[in-house]
Amino acid sequence: MKIRPLHDRVIVKRKEVESKSAGGIVLTGSAAGKSTRGEVLAVGNGRILESGDVKPLDVKVGDVVIFSEGYGAKTEKIDNQEVLIISESDILAIVEA
């Protein structure tokens, strides 16, 4: 299924990150918590400004981002994979290699 977010929305697939406890024990499943890193799968056209102009988004498809799951984050299942639909303002940083 192809999905295209509207306006300043971004579709992110959560990246699995290995978590370790303070004692060095590898945590898995619910003990590890959910990652706040993900890969951008799709982006909207941009934020509509008061002037009516559209400001393009700073993130692009393929970027790895660190995000905050704000109150507006929506979890969806698309093609048997869980994705998040968030606003660009919920993205805190782009991870550069």
Swiss-Prot record:
GO terms for molecular function: ATP binding; metal ion binding; protein folding chaperone; protein-folding chaperone binding; unfolded protein binding. GO terms for cellular component: cytoplasm. GO terms for biological process: chaperone cofactor-dependent protein refolding. The keyword Transport does not apply. CDD domains: cpn10. InterPro entries: Chaperonin_GroES, Chaperonin_GroES_sf, Chaprnonin_Cpn10_CS, GroES-like_sf. Keywords: Chaperone, Cytoplasm. Pfam families: Cpn10. It is found in: Cytoplasm. Heptamer of 7 subunits arranged in a ring. Interacts with the chaperonin GroEL. Together with the chaperonin GroEL, plays an essential role in assisting protein folding. The GroEL-GroES system forms a nano-cage that allows encapsulation of the non-native substrate proteins and provides a physical environment optimized to promote and accelerate protein folding. GroES binds to the apical surface of the GroEL ring, thereby capping the opening of the GroEL channel. Belongs to the GroES chaperonin family. This is Co-chaperonin GroES. It comes from Erwinia tasmaniensis (strain DSM 17950 / CFBP 7177 / CIP 109463 / NCPPB 4357 / Et1/99). The gene is groES.
